[in-house]
Amino acid sequence: MQFLKHDAELVRLLANCDSEVARARSNEDLLKVIDKLSAFKGGLEFDHAQSLVLLMLAIAAAVPAMAGVIPMVFVAACLGFASLYIWMSRKAAFDELPKKIARKCSFLSNGLWDPGGSADERFSQLSGEFDDYDRGNDSRRIEASAKGTFQGARHELSFVFHHLRYVNSHIKNKCDGESERVYESFDRFSLVVDFPWVKGVAVRSNLPDKKIAKRKVFETTFDDFNRTFMFCGDSELACARFATPPTLVFLLSLCQRLTNVNLEFSSQGHLCLSFDDAEVMAYQDPGTLEDLPGFYAKIKQGLKLPNLFPVLALVHELAELQDNNFELPLTVTDDMEQ
């Protein structure tokens, strides 16, 4: 039964490594995890012996079940399900570990950390402060978050990156007169930044699925801006102070850098910069556990986030445009109420 022992030891190793990755405080800690994987005797491959034994028992139970022995139908189904579940769960654990190591390495290499709290708690806080999280008529969830600081020439900006996944559903009519409910999953990304210089203003090129909170919509004297964005605010004064010509030019250029970009400045002094671009938090794939030497080398080198900090630099540029803005250099006219 040595093959059963090997699989059991590998399961324990992966679980232990998973815990150590979660506790890692440096890349050296992650390298120790990879060393432990390299030292494991017998190879990092499951024999799937337990799954195969259960599958054979399921096949054996299926013979009398096919002959009409009703209880054996239940036995065969349970054994078959158990075999599939064990095989899939072990494969998932093996595939997910290098992804978790890579993600933690990207955090440690770039001065990021987990913001704490549960995904539900984070979503509740964000959706209460920003309209952009009011998406998905079926479900919505924060998939991942990362906290950090960006040091610019003038300001240090505290930020949290969030990955929102939401699902829309609708009824689709088929040719035969029947109908079915169709589910579509979408991803939305955001940077929530401490931004005390602007409050109660929203600039949107992409509206959430549900109706946003009722606010006045304003127009500027920049036609290109008016065609690109919906500009809302708590007051005409707040909008006028925000909508300086350099700021409007900056926002038009930002729209070329990020897809479906929105900016919401909450009354609590936070900016939610949201967009559809997953590559903002992308890093080079270090590979899998099948090539441990190559995986080790890339983790040792560290995983950069080449697209995150340029976006944060843009947020800092906006802060520089707004941090001493107390005059009303641009006329903003009340256009309509939403």
Question: What are the language-model segments listed below?
Answer:
Residues 119-167, 179-338:
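Charged, low-complexity intrinsically disordered regions
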Residues 104-114:
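Membrane-cytosol interface motif
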Residues 49-53, 63-79:
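Hydrophobic alpha-helical transmembrane segments
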Residues 44-52, 86:
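General structural concept
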